């Protein structure tokens, strides 16, 4: 008997660093292809998918501003452009395997992609297209986690999935500490006041105010995204 899928529309957030794979910079084509195939499994199961990708594999606004030459505002805008580069790369990977995809940018770049209009984004999703949201919120000083949460709320997502390199949320970094304990569920308040890194406080507060569940899972496990949406235990953590 097939497991019933409980979430029809989701937003998946990937970090830019994840696209670099084992490299320190750029885009690993093998990682890009893996992510595209994971997204295809969702679409094939009638899940409407929005995507937000960070830009840290190219440039991070905070890091760019540390040298004292580039102002934080300009650094953040540079980071937004990096997310558009990643969005276009992901669009190519998705279309390469047969998925109709649109990129919408919070900053107008009409020669490359659509400008973000939430009603148009929803219409694309209803038609079975994948929508990738680039350029963050379009404003400096906001993270792509906050942008992902904002877009998830605007398009009416059932949940937001933060796809990472670990199986969920831990009380400390599992890559550094062997005794790290996985936390299957966590309240918004615990995520806000604790030392546990899930998303930045703005993103979590926004999710809390709008009762949007946050799921953290391993993006590198084949089939894991679809399992998460089917609510199978043991492969994710949830903040709600």
From Swiss-Prot:
This protein's pathway: Pyrimidine metabolism; CTP biosynthesis via de novo pathway; UDP from UMP (UMPK route): step 1/1
Reported regulation of activity: Inhibited by UTP.
GO BP field: 'de novo' CTP biosynthetic process; UDP biosynthetic process
Gene3D superfamilies from the UniProt entry: Acetylglutamate kinase-like
Major location (coarse): cytoplasm
Pfam families assigned to the protein according to its UniProt record, in alphabetical order: AA_kinase
Subunit structure, interactors included: Homohexamer.
HAMAP family, A to Z: PyrH_B
UniProt name for this protein: Uridylate kinase
């Amino acid at each position: 008997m097939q497991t019933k899928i409980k979430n029809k529309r989701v937003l998946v957030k990937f970090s830019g660093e994840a696209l670099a794979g084992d490299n320190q910079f750029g885009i690993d084509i093998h990682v890009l292809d893996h992510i595209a195939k994971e997204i295809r499994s969702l679409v094939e199961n009638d899940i409407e998918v929005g995507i937000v990708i960070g830009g840290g594999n190219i440039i991070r606004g905070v890091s760019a501003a540390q040298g004292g030459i580039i102002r934080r505002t300009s650094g953040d805008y540079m980071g937004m452009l990096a997310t558009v580069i990643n969005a276009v790369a992901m669009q190519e990977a998705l279309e390469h395997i047969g998925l109709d995809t649109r990129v919408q940018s919070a900053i107008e770049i009409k020669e490359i992609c659509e400008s973000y209009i939430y009603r148009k984004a929803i219409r694309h999703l209803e038609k079975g297209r994948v929508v990738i949201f680039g350029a963050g919120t379009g404003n400096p000083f906001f993270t792509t986690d906050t942008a992902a949460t904002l877009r998830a709320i605007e398009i009416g997502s059932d949940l937001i999935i933060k796809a990472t390199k670990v199986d969920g949320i831990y009380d400390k970094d599992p890559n550094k500490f062997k005794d790290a304990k996985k936390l299957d569920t966590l309240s918004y308040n615990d995520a806000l006041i604790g030392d546990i890194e899930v998303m930045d406080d703005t993103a979590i507060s926004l999710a809390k105010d709008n009762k949007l569940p946050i799921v953290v899972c391993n993006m590198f496990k084949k089939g894991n995204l679809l399992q998460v949406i089917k609510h199978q235990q043991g492969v994710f953590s949830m903040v709600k």
